[in-house]
Structure formats: C-alpha cells, structure tokens
Amino acid sequence: VDTQPKHIGVLRAYATRHGAGPLPTEDAQLIAQLPDPHNGSGPWQGPFRVGHFDAVLARYALEVVAHAQATASPTDVRFTSASARGIDSLIITCLDRLAGQTSLQLADGYIDQSGVLHRTLPLPPTSETTTQAAAQQTHFLQQLRPHYRALQSFSEPGLPAAAQAYLAAISEELGVQVAAVSLGRTAQEKRALSVGT
C-alpha cells in the first residue's frame, strides 16, 4: 500500500476569473453560454469572466508549485512526494458544461507582437517583490494573443470519444495524467479515470 501523500491539482475544463486582470482566453460568447449562478458579479470581486482552457496559465501554475517544492525545507511534508511537474495528477471539473458547444479550443501558447509563440511564462526573479512581478506579468500578458488548438466538440452526456480527446489534450499539454473528471453537480457524476481513458 502506497502511504505517501499525493498532490492532486483541480482545474475547470475552461478558464475563469473574477474581476480585473489578465484572462488571455476570455471569450464573450463563452461568458454568455456558460453562466454561473454561484459566481456572479460583486462589488468587491468584480465580474465573473470565462475563457477557453489556458494551458499556458496552467503550466505556469504547475511551475509555481514545482518551484515551491524545490525551495521548501526537506522536512516540509507538504512537498515530499509530488512529481517534477508539481502535482501527481489532475481532476478536471465542469466538463459537462462544455457539452453542446459548437466549437472547442484550448490555448496551447501565446503569440507576441513579433509573431513569436510562447508556450510558457517565465517565473519572476526572486529578487522582485510580488507587486513588481505581478505588474510585469500583467504587462507581458497584455501584449499577447492566444494561439488556439481546435478540438472536436461533443453534445452527448458522459464521456464520449470527443470529451475523452479533450481530457487527453489537457493531459498532453500539461504533462500530467487526468485521474478524475466531474460531469455534473452530484457525487454520482464524478468519475475516476483509468490511464488512457
């Protein structure tokens, strides 16, 4: 029996954000098609925004976690067993919300003003304050446009082949296995996945 803790990342099947700040894959059509009654606009958090799955931002999050693990104390049990990617596996939520979309795409990179494709975002230097780093990253992101990878849409409930291909694309882009998926709001709609599913 494996008694080591596992580090599991949880992401929606599409990008979301509250309030101001960069959301490179934001799409007004998705906002209209994927309303979230539990995440409306608020005076302190601003509007709830929606975009296509952003593999670049997800990779950045994995790098931040991996960096935290690499710089943690050897006795810090939070980071004793995670993979080099920062987590051992992923759970993707809200996949059912994408059923019936006329097209599916995910951002696999960003294109800068010179036409250069960036597949990752650099971690800020440790000499900068959090505020400085955030300002630089925001400025950098505002100069870019997403590069999209088109995927086949699906309308059937559950895990039809196109939904499985969408999960496989996320796994491929991030280099992390998708171990489970949420296909609805109830516990019965959560599904563990075997490798290759």
Predicted segments — roles?
Residues 1-197:
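Non-transmembrane, aqueous-exposed alpha-helical and coiled segments at domain scale
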